[in-house]
């Protein structure tokens, strides 16, 4: 029989008395009444805030969105398969936040900031609230620096400035994502941090985009936020705000940032699904009444900050998918009214072989003109007008049997201008190359080149300038002005390439 020494017992009792903690922790808890379709109804949680994070017994997190008299409507940010009627819910006292920092660059994360690229955890110590207030009027500055996309048609006719919101709108499969990826690739030596937010897309599509960025070295300055089609609606709804928060961190550090929301149509659909399941009253096209606010508070976070705030900027390129080119539907008109212009992509132009398929007539940039570089502004002034007139004449000439010489000349030049603006995917052009191409077309220096050889001329001119006139390229890239000497050099180069092409054709 084991003998128990009294001093051992007293020592144990003393230790337990010393270790006794008399502090009482108060936790705000509730009970699940009903769960299904990504929504939980919870009784209790008396002190919960709107938008507060809550935690269920099985570890699933949710956001309290509907605060009603006798219950709280919570959207689940996970499968929630382990949640049952009667299980407890705990309020965390926190609003959703996301980790931020330089360690995010080159990574693929979900809308909660959790790495999903298999490269381990993120080594970040800072975080930002997913919902942050937009900069005020005094904290902003007017847009005055260019955000070069590398796409000649956009940089010449629909220029985008740093801090601008430019909508990319068009039907499915018209090259909306391609324009945005090209813009990211073009920031390689511009010291711009890019954030690509994929909302409700196929995981294969996101993997493909990520691979393209990695192959071309663009992932080093890019963060990918992915809420795939298989994710709960709550995560698809949160994804754009997460992307904005990650970009805001760099913006307030004084850096230029570019955020792409691909696409906000799917975010609006996820928000509609959540709202209908929460039994909020439906409005036009069954969207809730605050879907405009959902997008406006997101896009207002894009800004060009004042000198006192560090001169940083966030440029937003939201994408909207239309049905059969209908830009007068609810979500497209909402986002058009919030943004500072739109690039409209047409499926008819795309199918006719014009890539990028930009409809110049209804595309516009409302603030980017102030940010356009002088070199291209000087020569591209008439480009948009000439193309718009060409479209009208082309439609008219289908019914006219004989055309006068001036009209034929205008049609002939319009065809060549349109060919010049064709550009393969993943091949953005530098400013000097864009200036050279647009100059050749607008000044009528390639009117003798056959239309079918204009694309070849564009390629050969760029190669000729790189190999024979590198001083022209460096001058334009540094000074960003087309001086009389540079113009003379350019004219000589164009004449040389044209004569070589015509001689080889003969």
From Swiss-Prot:
GO-annotated cellular components: plasma membrane-derived thylakoid membrane; proton-transporting ATP synthase complex
Enzyme class: translocase
EC number: 7.1.2.2
Residue(s) at site: Required for activity: 363
Localization in the cell: Cellular thylakoid membrane
Function according to Swiss-Prot or TrEMBL: Produces ATP from ADP in the presence of a proton gradient across the membrane. The alpha chain is a regulatory subunit.
Family, as annotated: Belongs to the ATPase alpha/beta chains family.
Name this polypeptide is given: ATP synthase subunit alpha
Gene name, Swiss-Prot/TrEMBL: atpA
